[in-house]
């Protein structure tokens, strides 16, 4: 196997690795975005319109208590997801760089 064939094989492997890293990054980004969307939804409650004002206030207080608990849980998930997303982003960037360098080397040999 000559140098051209070796670089060709190496670029194929590098491309597969890049594709895998990009899929992992996409999955992490979608999970993180879902948590961000859930947080945004918690900030937009739809107030009941046909209730007595005292009952509506009680409903609002209970909703806020529940929403605060959900925010706490979502924020824990979001912190983990953000760390995973940052790691996946770094890994994808490295794979992209390696693939680009191998492509340039292959171009010089051809």
Predicted feature descriptions by range:
Residues 1-110:
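Charge-rich amphipathic alpha-helical interaction elements
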């Amino acid at each position: 196997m000559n140098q051209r064939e070796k670089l060709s094989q190496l670029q194929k492997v590098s491309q597969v690795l890049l594709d895998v890293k990009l899929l992992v990054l996409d999955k992490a980004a979608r999970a993180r975005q879902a948590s961000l969307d859930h947080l945004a939804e918690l900030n937009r409650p739809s107030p009941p319109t046909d209730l007595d004002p005292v009952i509506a206030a009680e409903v609002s207080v209970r909703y806020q208590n529940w929403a605060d608990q959900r925010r706490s849980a979502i924020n824990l998930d979001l912190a983990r997801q953000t760390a995973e997303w940052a790691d996946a982003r770094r890994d994808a960037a490295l794979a992209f760089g390696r693939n680009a360098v191998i492509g340039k080397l292959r171009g010089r040999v051809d």
